[in-house]
């Protein structure tokens, strides 16, 4: 850096430089008209400086116009008094038609570490007109002088005089380390470039640039790319003498020019006094360490900035290691007041020459960018948690092992629970879901199972491997217990109605979202769906999630095949398989009268869901002169065919289920047609038996049609021994095959592709029945449950074993 006795910005132009800047048609300088106002310049002790500057300036002007010009001296050490100065008057301004985008436009980008004292004393600069707008000077009374001596600062504040705006705009960009000189509006890519910082960690983290040493010494000030000039007297002098490439071609995009040459409103400070381009609202300026010295501009792009701005990428670790004093400085930078202060700044002319030599120990680097696009802080990006759609694997869920251990030791509770009824809001065609949910809530073992699983918040469990379990745990916790009424009140229906106070209805949107999470065919909103299909979706989904949790508790060499039953095959394919040689899943079983049969069982692992709803059926194939072939298949619902005219009751449908049927057209390996028969029996009865009355059938002429016929169903259902497999008839007692109705899901309407679903549930606290139609809840009598109409027909029947009541 040059000393005070050195040469200044307007001295010693070379011939090429003089012609380039002051002779070409685009580089004329318009002087203001002569005025009687006289501005004393600088400290009184610096008379030589004033004379030299005036002489050199006069020589320059004389070379341009060929005429002698009046002596106009400018001072830079006094705060401009907005009440007396005329910053916007053209009589006191110097304008130029220098094109900022032309090769002749040279800027020196200098920077140095700044304290809050120096940061607060900047002016708003219009890079297009080369003028300063009115600056907002904060209160600097509490700041020390830049040279460290309070006496000197006090004396210099008294000597400051007015200056026309814009003349010393090139003195605003400063720094104490070698920095990039922007020639032709951009940085050279072959020399070292610097933007200094007080934090030594920054120098270690930022890569070193290899650009050419087009740098200059600069006084102690900072660079505001929106509002400040980018040079000073010594830095411009060095740039002109040592690093001038005025003839170098340059392209400056309109976008870049708009960003770097935005004039500030007169009399008002820029909202954010940083190098961050103001339109980028998404940029976090307070967390960027570069904001503390007003030097950096965030960017994620590479290359040369189209507006010639040297960009420093934000280092995420830098913000975390920022010093407290730097943080406070950043706050001072951002929250500048909008009004000017009457107190003079603590800045002096002599301070421009202090600490001006480059630092040999500080490592600096820069990143050039062509497109100054808005970017977010890398620090925020690193902290963002990756959000995955759908469930995560159980291995990535830290809570999964806890739930697995809980489910492994859980014991089902069948004790009835009295819950305060709540309706479910239906904003779409979700009635088939709402009806199914009300039936499951009324199922005591299902309710107790879900209540035994703890509820985890998003903070405790940001990702889950069991979204379906989580949703039903949340659903059951929506309902609270209701005290059981005395028997005296139960005798009067009027009193019961007055005592039943349903809770506020709610929308189980988290249940609806499960259809999307699992990409089910049921996920299309507004589509009329089937309640039995949805029940199967729920029970199978819960079962599979529990199987995944169960794997965590088994050795790695033990594998569980998630399979609720064998793949569906036709009757002929199944019979052909029976003739093949036996496998590990087959065994020979001796039945009554010493008849033997080969039995196959599908892979099946028990879970709490199968312990509640799971049963087994035995399908036996009889063939003359061959052993019986049997297959055990699990089920969650019993599918009852009611199409036959003979079927009028549920008992009729159950007997039809186990009736022996003949299979026509079956041939053996020798292609001989033989007569075979098939029969299905109940091998194992579940605690909760769900009967599906198959009302929707396909006809060859009319497609899918609804069977509108009344099927009688009792409140207490006894499973006949004739329905049981021969091997279990003597093992299942009457109490284990007697069931009581606790929920009925109805389908309303005559169409198979439309209609509505409602549910009747038994309320133990009421000792009666409730009819729930979405968010409507009302009390009904038992005879209304079993009585069907043409418009409302039973579709799903939920029974509980009486020995578990």
UniProtKB/Swiss-Prot annotation:
Catalytic-site annotation from UniProt: 431 (nucleophile), 756 (proton acceptor)
Pfam families: UCH
Coiled-coil segments: none
Any one GO molecular-function label of the UniProt entry: cysteine-type endopeptidase activity
Compositionally biased spans, kind Polar residues: 143-153
Location in the cell: Cytoplasm; Nucleus
Claim: DNA repair is one of the keywords in the record: yes
Region of interest (Disordered), ranges: 139-170, 561-593
Catalytic activity line of the entry: Thiol-dependent hydrolysis of ester, thioester, amide, peptide and isopeptide bonds formed by the C-terminal Gly of ubiquitin (a 76-residue protein attached to proteins as an intracellular targeting signal)
Keywords, ordered alphabetically: Autophagy, Cytoplasm, DNA damage, DNA repair, Hydrolase, Nucleus, Protease, Thiol protease, Ubl conjugation pathway
Domain USP, residue spans: 422-802
CDD domains associated with the record: Peptidase_C19
Protein name (Swiss-Prot/TrEMBL): Ubiquitin carboxyl-terminal hydrolase 10
Organism: Xenopus tropicalis (Western clawed frog)
């Amino acid at each position: 850096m040059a000393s005070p006795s050195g040469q200044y910005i307007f001295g010693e132009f070379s011939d090429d430089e003089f012609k380039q800047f002051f002779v070409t048609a685009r580089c004329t300088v318009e002087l203001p008209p002569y005025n009687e106002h006289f501005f004393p310049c600088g400290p009184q002790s610096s008379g030589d400086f004033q004379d030299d500057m005036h002489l050199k300036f006069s020589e320059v002007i004389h070379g341009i116009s060929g005429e002698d010009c009046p002596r106009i001296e400018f001072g830079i050490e006094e705060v401009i008094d907005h009440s007396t100065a005329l910053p916007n008057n053209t009589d006191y301004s110097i304008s130029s038609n220098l094109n900022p985008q032309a090769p002749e436009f040279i800027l020196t980008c200098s920077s140095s570490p700044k304290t809050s004292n120096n940061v607060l004393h900047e002016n708003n600069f219009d890079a297009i007109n080369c003028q300063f707008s009115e600056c907002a000077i904060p209160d600097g009374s509490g700041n020390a002088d830049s040279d460290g001596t309070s006496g000197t600062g006090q004396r210099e504040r008294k000597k400051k005089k007015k200056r026309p705006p814009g003349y010393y705009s090139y003195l605003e960009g400063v720094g104490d380390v070698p920095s990039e000189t922007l020639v032709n509006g951009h940085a050279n890519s072959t020399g070292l470039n610097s933007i200094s910082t007080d934090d030594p960690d920054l120098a270690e983290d930022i890569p070193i640039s290899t650009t050419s040493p087009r740098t200059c010494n600069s006084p102690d000030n900072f660079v505001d790319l929106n509002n400040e000039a980018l040079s000073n007297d010594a830095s411009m002098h060095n740039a002109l003498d040592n690093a001038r490439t005025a003839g170098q071609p340059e392209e400056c995009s309109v976008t870049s020019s708009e960003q770097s040459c935005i004039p500030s409103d007169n009399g008002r400070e820029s909202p954010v006094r940083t190098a961050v381009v103001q339109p980028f609202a998404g940029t976090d300026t307070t967390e960027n360490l570069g904001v503390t010295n007003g030097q950096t501009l965030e960017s994620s792009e590479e290359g040369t900035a189209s507006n010639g701005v040297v960009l420093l990428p934000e280092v995420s670790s830098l913000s975390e290691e920022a010093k407290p004093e730097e943080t406070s400085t950043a706050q001072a930078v951002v929250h500048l007041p909008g009004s000017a202060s009457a107190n003079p700044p603590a800045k002096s002319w002599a301070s421009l020459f202090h600490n001006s030599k480059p630092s040999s120990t500080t490592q600096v680097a820069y990143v050039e960018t062509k497109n100054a696009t808005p970017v977010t802080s890398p620090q925020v990006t690193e902290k963002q948690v990756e959000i995955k759609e759908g469930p995560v694997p159980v291995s990535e869920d830290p809570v999964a092992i806890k739930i697995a251990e809980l489910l492994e030791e859980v014991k089902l509770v069948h004790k009835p629970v009295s819950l305060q009824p709540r309706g479910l809001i239906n904003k779409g065609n979700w009635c088939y879901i709402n009806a199914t949910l009300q039936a499951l809530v009324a199922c005591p073992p299902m309710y107790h199972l879900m209540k035994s699983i703890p509820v985890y918040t998003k903070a405790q469990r940001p990702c889950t491997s069991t979204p379906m379990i989580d949703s039903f745990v949340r659903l059951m916790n929506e309902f609270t217990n209701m005290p059981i009424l005395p028997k005296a009140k139960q005798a009067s229906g009027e009193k019961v109605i007055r005592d039943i106070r349903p809770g506020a209805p709610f929308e189980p949107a988290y249940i609806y979202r499960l259809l999307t999470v699992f990409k089910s065919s049921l996920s299309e909103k507004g589509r009329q769906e089937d309640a039995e299909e949805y029940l199967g979706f729920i029970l199978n989904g819960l079962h599979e999630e529990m199987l995944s949790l169960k794997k965590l508790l088994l050795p790695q060499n033990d594998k569980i095949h998630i399979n609720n039953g064998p793949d569906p095959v036709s009757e002929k394919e199944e019979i052909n398989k029976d003739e093949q040689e036996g496998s590990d899943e087959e065994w020979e079983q001796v039945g009554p009268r010493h008849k033997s049969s080969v039995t196959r069982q599908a892979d099946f692992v028990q879970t709490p869901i199968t312990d509640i709803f799971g049963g087994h059926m035995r399908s036996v194939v009889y063939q003359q002169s061959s052993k019986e072939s049997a297959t055990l298949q699990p089920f969650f619902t019993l599918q009852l065919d009611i199409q036959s005219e003979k079927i009028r009751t549920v008992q009729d449908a159950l007997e039809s289920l186990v009736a022996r049927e003949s299979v026509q057209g079956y041939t053996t390996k020798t292609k001989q047609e033989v007569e075979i028969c098939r029969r299905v029996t109940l091998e194992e009865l579940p605690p909760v038996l769900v009967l599906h009355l198959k009302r929707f059938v396909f006809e060859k002429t009319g497609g899918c049609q609804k069977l509108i016929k009344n099927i009688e169903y009792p409140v207490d259902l006894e499973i006949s021994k004739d329905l049981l497999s021969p091997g279990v008839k003597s093992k299942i007692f009457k109490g284990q095959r007697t069931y009581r109705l606790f929920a009925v899901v109805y389908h309303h309407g005559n169409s198979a592709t439309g209609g509505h679903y409602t549910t009747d549930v038994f309320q133990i606290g009421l000792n009666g029945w409730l009819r729930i139609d979405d968010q409507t809840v009302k009390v009904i009598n038992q005879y209304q449950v079993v009585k069907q109409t043409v418009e409302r027909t039973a579709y799903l029947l939920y029974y509980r074993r009486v020995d578990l009541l």
